[in-house]
Amino acid sequence: MSKRDYYEVLGVGRDASEREIKKAYKRLAMKFHPDRNPGDKAAEASFKEVKEAYEILTDSDKKAAYDQFGHAGVDPNRGGGGFGGGADFGDVFGDVFGDIFGGGRRGGQRQAARGSDLRYNLELSLEEAVRGLTKELRIPTLATCDLCDGSGAKKGSSPTTCGTCHGQGQVQMRQGFFAVQQACPTCHGRGKIIKDPCGKCHGEGRVEKSKTLSVKIPAGVDTGDRIRLSGEGEAGEFGAPPGDLYVQVTVREHAIFVRDGNNLYCEVPISFSTAALGGEIEVPTLDGKVNLKIPSETQTGRMFRLRGKGVKSVRSHAVGDLLCKVVMETPVNLNDKQKELLREFDNTLTGSSKKHSPKAEGFFDGVKKFFQDLNS
């Protein structure tokens, strides 16, 4: 099946800036992320398609090749279209004009591939994310074979030059007027053949292995943050550089606090008497309890700010605040005496609601005026 246009995949125009491309990628990656769509094969395929498009269009060299030649310009396997034989447009025109003017571009052997990048999804509690910590991570990966040191050849032997391409990694085929170069079918473009493969890695130069890494998580990380560990991905082919490891952070929901950037939010219940008369209550923070003074006549929903009790920014020395929303609790399970006292108290307010409940009085005045206007 033919690939979709990379610009179409990201939903941007061909003149899109790198910033616009990154913005589109972030939105689509969040939409199709496997963690948000568990078991959804279509979403997983879309996520891979979006990631591939992003990697090509944010690499200046690959983007230039793609803009000029399309998918053929960035296909690592050099898969061609109507010209057949696996050639790309660079091969076709280079060889044609080389034959005409003498010399021309000659294909080289395929470079050993860099190791693949790995991703590790790390879930943290809010406390861990705010304070930072060191985590031991067990990572399944492909490691360089220690028996053959990554060569793929049996100890004491070494790869030999391919007899088909004579070490060039490519062979030339003529198709009418065109001279087409393609990867050597014998050595698959490497220019070398392993006649006596290593018994441990079977000629691959890499073996499956798990390794344990000690990773320092900085204080203040949040969901969506990514930590890059250079060179800790899969080993490269036959001595090529390794890939990187990306630790993707997710912070679990907290029972008390809600985080928004560097600020924390929580709801604190207060009694009717404390709201009316004022007082002092204990408020939880990530560093322990602190006292919060509640002024008299406090209404439910009022927000109090405790400066410096939020989260320290992972990118600066700034520290957020803790914002506490007080919620007045209605008394429950009252006995007869308590109910009678409340009735007596309510009777003392009769006829003076505007003085003691200005919001309620204003509300009912508004309702009364609404119906008067409706009937007039």
Curated annotation (Swiss-Prot):
What transmembrane ranges does the database entry give? Answer: none
The Gene Ontology CC terms held by the record are: cytoplasm
Residue ranges constituting the J domain according to the UniProt record: 5-70
- Which windows of the sequence hold CXXCXGXG motif repeats? 145-152, 162-169, 184-191, 198-205
Q: Which Pfam families match?
A: DnaJ, DnaJ_C, DnaJ_CXXCXGXG
Mention one GO biological process in which this protein takes part, according to its record: response to heat
- What is its subcellular localisation? Cytoplasm
Arranged from A to Z, the UniProt key words for this protein are: Chaperone, Cytoplasm, DNA replication, Metal-binding, Repeat, Stress response, Zinc, Zinc-finger
Q: InterPro entries under this entry?
A: DnaJ, DnaJ_C, DnaJ_domain, DnaJ_domain_CS, HSP40/DnaJ_pept-bd, HSP_DnaJ_Cys-rich_dom, HSP_DnaJ_Cys-rich_dom_sf, J_dom_sf
Give yes or no: UniProt keyword Cytoplasm. yes
Is Glycoprotein among the key words of this record? no
CDD domains in the cross-refs: DnaJ, DnaJ_C, DnaJ_zf
Which co-factors does it depend on?
Answer: Zn(2+)
Question: How is its cofactor bound, per UniProt?
Answer: Binds 2 Zn(2+) ions per monomer.
Q: What is known of its domains?
A: The J domain is necessary and sufficient to stimulate DnaK ATPase activity. Zinc center 1 plays an important role in the autonomous, DnaK-independent chaperone activity of DnaJ. Zinc center 2 is essential for interaction with DnaK and for DnaJ activity.
Subunit annotation: Homodimer.
Record-stated family: Belongs to the DnaJ family.
Name by which UniProt lists this protein: Chaperone protein DnaJ
Q: Which gene encodes it?
A: dnaJ
